[in-house]
Amino acid sequence: MRFSLSLIGLVASGSLAAAHPSHCGAEPSEDFDILSKDITDKLAAEASEIHAPIEVTTFFHVVASSKSVADGYISDKMLQDQLAVMNKAYAPHGFSFKHGNTTRTINPTWATGGDELNMKYALHMGKYADLNLYFVKKLADNSHGSCPYPSNPYPGTPGYIKDGCTILSSTVPGGSQSNANRGLTTVHEIGHYMGLYHTFQGGCSTELGDRVADTPAQKNGTVGCPSSRDSCPDQAGLDPIHNYMDTSDDVCRTEFTPKQAMRMQEMYKEFRAGK
């Protein structure tokens, strides 16, 4: 969405659009808006550039209620296919994901959204530059996935340990989730890990939006896969229903925009690289 903003207006507004309730539980905080303001301003001034390719070490954590796929115990093949989907989506934008390790845990409480912090304290691997993906049978908010936005936490603190995405296991390739079993929930949540908002952040507002200049304004998340949609008719452009950061069906989502790619590169460089 094209935008203009000031730090004062940004904080005072408190306008943080809620995600489509059945898809994504990630919610940006005002602190994240403030932390990322310099990058937002840099991109608005078109002063950014694509950096050298970034390889992200990725740790898979399968957390299930039993050793049944129905209870979240997805196979190594499904994880390999998920990694392939991630790399296909992000490779054109300067990112690749390298498998670091896989853990498997049977814990009915953790597998159904309970005691998340202790789960992550027990399972978290690597550094802040790395990516931890937790595949569970059910999330506490019944969404398909959730992922904290980047910040500047101290190692070992809850904010550091909670970093990483929690994903509904049935959304991986070959999973059972209707219209969302091609692995794009994970692609979407990694977008938040990289600092992207939803494309419908801020709704039809011309002041806020998703802080990316080449995604048209969008009132709310897309349901299904319409042939076309224009939820902000007074703003230029049609809804970006094919964008990975919308909430369309998996079959509908195929792209990031160039400005989204630039934002991810800048955000990773600022908040994660070397940390």
UniProtKB/Swiss-Prot annotation:
Enzyme class: hydrolase
Keywords: Disulfide bond, Glycoprotein, Hydrolase, Metal-binding, Metalloprotease, Protease, Secreted, Signal, Virulence, Zinc
Protein name: Extracellular metalloprotease MGYG_03559
Lineage of the species this protein comes from: Eukaryota, Fungi, Dikarya, Ascomycota, Pezizomycotina
Chain segments annotated as coiled-coil in the UniProt record: none
A Gene Ontology cellular-component term: extracellular region
Record flagged with keyword Cytoplasm: no
Predominant place of localization: secreted
Organism: Arthroderma gypseum (strain ATCC MYA-4604 / CBS 118893) (Microsporum gypseum)
Keyword Zinc (UniProt): yes
